[in-house]
Structures are given as C-alpha cells and as structure tokens.
C-alpha cells in the first residue's frame, strides 16, 4: 500500500505539472506526428528537434520540475525508511524463532536453552549478535531515484512519446523502488532466519553436540541454479559452502557475494551425529 500510494502521488504530481505546459507540448507532439505521417525526413528531424527542445525546457531545464523531482524522491526515500523500519522490527522475532527451533530436534540427554525476543534485541543493540538494523542512505536513495526518473523521461522524449506514455514510464521507477525494497526485505529475513539457526547450532556444539549443517534449497523456478546444486550438501559448523560465486556461511550471509544472497529463500538444518 505504501508503494502504491507513492506511485499514485508521482502520477498526480506529474499530471498536474504537465497540464500547465500541455498546450505547447501537445503542439510539439502533434507537429511531430504529422511530420512522421508525411514521410519527409527533413520535416521529421526538425519536428523531433523542436519536440525535444520544448520538452526539455519544461522538464530537465526547468527549476520547478527539478523541485518536483526533489520532493518526489524525498517522499520515496521516506517510504523506504518506513518499510525498512517494519523489517527491522521483525528481524529479532525471526532470529528468535529460528534460534529456538533447535529445541525441536529433541536430542536425548540434551536440554536446549531457549532465548526470548527481548534478550535478542538487547544483544543486537550491544553488537553481541551480528544482526545490525539496516538504514536508508537518504542522499543515495534520492540520487538513485532521480537518475532513474530523468532517464525514463529522456527515453520518452527521444522516442517522441506523448505525455501519458511518459507518465507510465515514470511509474516504472516506483515499481523498481518497490521491487528493490521487497528484495532487501526478503534478504534481511532470510539472513535473520539462518543466522538464528547458525547461532543455535554453535551453542549446541559448545554444549558437546556433534553435528553438521545441511543446505535446504527452495524447489521452484525462482531458485538459483547454484543454490539448487547446494541442496543437501553437508558441511561443518565453521565450514562455508562454496559455489562459483564464492563462499557463503549460511543463506542470507551478509559477507557473501550479492549474487549468492539477494532474494535467497534457502535455509539450513542441523544433522546431529552424536555427543563429544
């Protein structure tokens, strides 16, 4: 809903702004269309140049347009902050659930000590658990979105597109922004899940439990081929899995290559061998 609202706001702002220049832009656009119909190359080139000049003058070269883009990207960055805040609030819960999941192993002669979410939050805040909350780099976020908005605008101008068609182009940027947020959220949750499991395995190992870790891939068309290849592969607690993109300690490992991490939905499970 957050991103749908942001997309709608962008469209409304664009429409309101462009309506104030509609007469001259429509004239330039219609002139270009007539030139194309005529088939006269010189007329087409002249009309295209005039269309580009007119459009750029009311957008990329206009201070009011620049202010609109700045306001829009600031709001998009704020939406990203809100969305990331939701995820940051959830990751301690995700970590806790997956840490405590080791108790389900029901190993004879071994009682696993559960942790609570408040304790996990305290450990995260004191850097005793490597699960730091993510933050939005506002400047970088705004710059990225402004670049993409202006890039879509330029492509539309160079293609000689109408105002409504360019408006649809701009909406793809908010879709990209939403997809990026979903990817980051999925990656953070996967990392929290498997970091919780990894830490629970380490605790059990320190108590004398001998085990290995098994990679569990998600079996569908969205799973990376190199993660499917890792499915069922067992390694020691301090051993990484390896593939063509390097080493990875667990699904969602923030120290691994991004190609091994982003959008990953894999997990790990303990394979208990006995006691030391």
Give residue ranges: language-model regions:
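Acidic, glycine-rich two-metal-ion catalytic cores of nucleic acid-processing enzymes
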Residues: 175-176, 180-276
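N-terminal leader/targeting and assembly helices and adjacent pre-domain segments
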Residues: 1-175, 271-276
């Amino acid at each position: 809903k957050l991103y749908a609202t942001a997309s709608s706001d962008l469209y409304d702002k664009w429409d309101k702004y462009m309506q104030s220049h509609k007469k001259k832009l429509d004239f330039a656009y219609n002139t270009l269309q007539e030139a194309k119909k005529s088939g006269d190359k010189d007329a087409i080139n002249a009309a295209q140049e005039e269309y580009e000049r007119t459009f750029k003058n009311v957008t990329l070269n206009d201070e009011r347009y620049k202010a609109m883009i700045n306001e829009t990207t600031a709001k998009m960055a704020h939406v990203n902050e809100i969305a990331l805040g939701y995820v940051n609030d959830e990751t301690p819960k995700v970590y806790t659930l997956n840490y405590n999941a080791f108790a389900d192993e029901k190993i004879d002669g071994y009682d696993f000590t559960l942790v609570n979410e408040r304790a996990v939050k305290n450990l995260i805040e004191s850097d005793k658990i490597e699960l730091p909350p993510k933050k939005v780099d506002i400047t970088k976020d705004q710059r990225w979105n402004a670049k993409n908005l202006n890039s879509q605008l330029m492509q539309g101008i160079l293609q000689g597109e109408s105002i409504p068609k360019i408006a649809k182009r701009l909406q793809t940027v908010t879709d990209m922004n939403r997809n990026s947020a979903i990817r980051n959220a999925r990656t953070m949750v996967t990392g929290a899940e498997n970091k919780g499991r990894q830490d629970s395995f380490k605790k059990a190992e320190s108590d004398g439990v001998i085990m290995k870790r098994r990679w569990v891939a998600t079996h569908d068309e969205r799973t990376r081929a190199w993660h499917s290849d890792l499915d069922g592969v067992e390694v020691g607690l301090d051993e990484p899995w390896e593939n063509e993109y390097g080493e990875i300690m667990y699904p969602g490992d923030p120290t691994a290559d991004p190609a091994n991490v982003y959008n990953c939905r894999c997990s790990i499970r303990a394979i208990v061998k006995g006691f030391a």
